[in-house]
Amino acid sequence: MAMAKARKPREALLWALSDLEENDFKKLKFYLRDMTLSEGQPPLARGELEGLIPVDLAELLISKYGEKEAVKVVLKGLKVMNLLELVDQLSHICLHDYREVYREHVRCLEEWQEAGVNGRYNQVLLVAKPSSESPESLACPFPEQELESVTVEALFDSGEKPSLAPSLVVLQGSAGTGKTTLARKMVLDWATGTLYPGRFDYVFYVSCKEVVLLLESKLEQLLFWCCGDNQAPVTEILRQPERLLFILDGFDELQRPFEEKLKKRGLSPKESLLHLLIRRHTLPTCSLLITTRPLALRNLEPLLKQARHVHILGFSEEERARYFSSYFTDEKQADRAFDIVQKNDILYKACQVPGICWVVCSWLQGQMERGKVVLETPRNSTDIFMAYVSTFLPPDDDGGCSELSRHRVLRSLCSLAAEGIQHQRFLFEEAELRKHNLDGPRLAAFLSSNDYQLGLAIKKFYSFRHISFQDFFHAMSYLVKEDQSRLGKESRREVQRLLEVKEQEGNDEMTLTMQFLLDISKKDSFSNLELKFCFRISPCLAQDLKHFKEQMESMKHNRTWDLEFSLYEAKIKNLVKGIQMNNVSFKIKHSNEKKSQSQNLFSVKSSLSHGPKEEQKCPSVHGQKEGKDNIAGTQKEASTGKGRGTEETPKNTYI
């Protein structure tokens, strides 16, 4: 039997040893005596090796180290002897076997199982968009051409031109649209053989915010991290880079919009490692999928050569209903919660965003379990977050002196969030939580934890359940971290920095922190804040917030501000009444996803501006309905705009 026919590592090992000439076999045993064979294992003694024939040596190595490690041991010796042809043949067997080892590793990832990624999954809507040709075009990323829905299976397809198959895909979407869940689901589906069968030998998931934990800024270390194995056969994995797919999840968490304004001016070595991949300087023939929020596109675009752009739009109406059924284990609770949401246009529309849908479900479940009647009517995503936070903050005791008193915990969460964003940090050690007087395990509604292997040690790190919670508490920090009599010098400086960076970055949408703070600064939000979080906003502080609101609204209306919708035909009249849009055309495209054939999916990109002061126009988006042109447009002066929601990672549901 030739080695190429070997089906198992033990068979390949035996044939590799048997192929050695007598003198080479003696040399291999000599090198094995002095070699550090496996972590924690002593070298083989001369007496153990003396007189052994190939089959005996194979049995000895397998009994001491197991099949896979035994192959690695022999490979080390053969490399020292420079028997590269035999190394190549044996490596191929090792690689083929390691694919299955890695697939099993992915299938068993505990944190993904807990997040429900491998269980009930709700589909999200994806549409293809062209790559942006210039930074200015980012404000109007849907040029005048047909936008088509795209499936995950077809992300790297070229249609009828195989030579033009994209090797780099940018998946962009607002916070909470389901990018992380989709990215992880792709890796799991590949591992189970249902996605890209035969196309990729390895699909690696890289969380951009976790790259900081790499021990070294080397590609080898990144692969060890992805495989969860410091002995992974890196050389063999990289032998055919065109059969590798790296999913870089959360580019916006690697490089935040305010990065250059803070203490961090240059790229860290670990960021540079990912930049080399993105620029195609490292492994230029591998495939890449990069997920990001729109804000980071201005930083990402200069790194790209040719990329396919895909936009994630969140849930369809059917998926919204399915999500409630999967989230609530009690059918009556699910029906009651969905009924509440359906009767509230703001909640129903917000639940198109999977992350906000999770927040709404968690909030409603918390209210029901406490026996409370839901009387609130949230007006925007900020109100939804306030309702969630006020529900899950620990209650004040009668004396107001509890270590977990409501206001103390709120202030601590705010200070942790602000410190993290100001220093470009999204992972926190337990010592950092203690510094802010936070007890991580008792605040699972806001903080999640994971254990990471750092060298020989295992360390626990915390993060906010989603970056949107960190943004929310960052916005709240301007109200609670000082003496509360005024916004405070430090807070005023930070707010001014927000405004300055916003002005310098031109047409970018506002950050989520700014959106939260703008909503909070509205006068009718003050009483809601005071009631929910047990602190009073002084007249001076209210005046400071009013000034910020005026500045922010002025800046917003002096620029083209992108607003993305996924609409259904029945919602058009409400949309036109709710906001005025400039140079907008609607693309109507029949969707088989709808329950009724009379309803059709709308994908809209609009440009909001301040009439005559508008500096940039977005071209119309044209489409067809069953072969006939059906274009509706309006050219009225823009007057309002709303930010977008957030993404969340639950304990055992979709997000």
UniProtKB/Swiss-Prot annotation:
In this chain, ATP is annotated as bound at 173-180
Q: Which residues form the NACHT domain?
A: 167-484
List each copy of the Pyrin domain by range: 1-96
- Single GO cellular component annotation? nuclear membrane
UniProt effect for mutating residue 252 to A: Reduced release of IL8 following invasive bacterial infection
> What tissue specificity does the UniProt entry give?
Highly expressed in basal and suprabasal epidermal cell layers with lower levels in dermal fibroblast cells (at protein level). Widely expressed with highest levels in heart, brain and skeletal muscle. Also expressed in liver, colon, dermis and epidermis. Little expression detected in myeloid cells or peripheral blood mononuclear cells.
Biased segments, Basic and acidic residues type: 611-629, 644-655
Keyword annotations for this protein, in alphabetical order, are: Adaptive immunity, ATP-binding, Cell membrane, Cytoplasm, Immunity, Inflammatory response, Innate immunity, Membrane, Nucleotide-binding
Q: What is its main location?
A: cytoplasm
Q: How does it assemble?
A: Oligomerizes. Interacts with PYCARD. Also interacts with CASP1 and IL1B. Interacts with NOD1 and components of the NOD1 signaling pathway including RIPK2, NR2C2/TAK1 and IKBKG/NEMO.
Ranges where the record places region Disordered: 597-655
| Gene for this chain | NLRP10
The record's subcellular location field reads: Cytoplasm; Cell membrane
Provide the topology term for how it sits in the membrane. Answer: Peripheral membrane protein
Known InterPro entries for this protein? DAPIN, DEATH-like_dom_sf, NACHT_NTPase, NLRP_innate_immun_reg, NOD1/2_WH, P-loop_NTPase
UniProt lineage: Eukaryota, Metazoa, Chordata, Craniata, Vertebrata
What is the protein's known function? Inhibits autoprocessing of CASP1, CASP1-dependent IL1B secretion, PYCARD aggregation and PYCARD-mediated apoptosis but not apoptosis induced by FAS or BID. Displays anti-inflammatory activity. Required for immunity against C.albicans infection. Involved in the innate immune response by contributing to pro-inflammatory cytokine release in response to invasive bacterial infection. Contributes to T-cell-mediated inflammatory responses in the skin.
Query: Domain comment, in the record's words?
Result: The pyrin and ATP-binding domains are required to elicit cytokine release following bacterial infection.
Q: What is the similarity comment for this entry?
A: Belongs to the NLRP family.
Q: Please give the record's induction comment.
A: By infection with the periodontal pathogens T.forsythia and F.nucleatum (at protein level).
Question: What Pfam families does this protein's entry cite?
Answer: NACHT (PF05729), NOD2_WH (PF17779), PYRIN (PF02758)
Name of the protein: NACHT, LRR and PYD domains-containing protein 10
Coiled-coil positions are none
GO aspect biological process, one term: innate immune response
Regions of biased composition (Polar residues) lie at: 597-609
Q: Name one GO molecular function term.
A: ATP binding
Q: Source species, please?
A: Homo sapiens (Human)
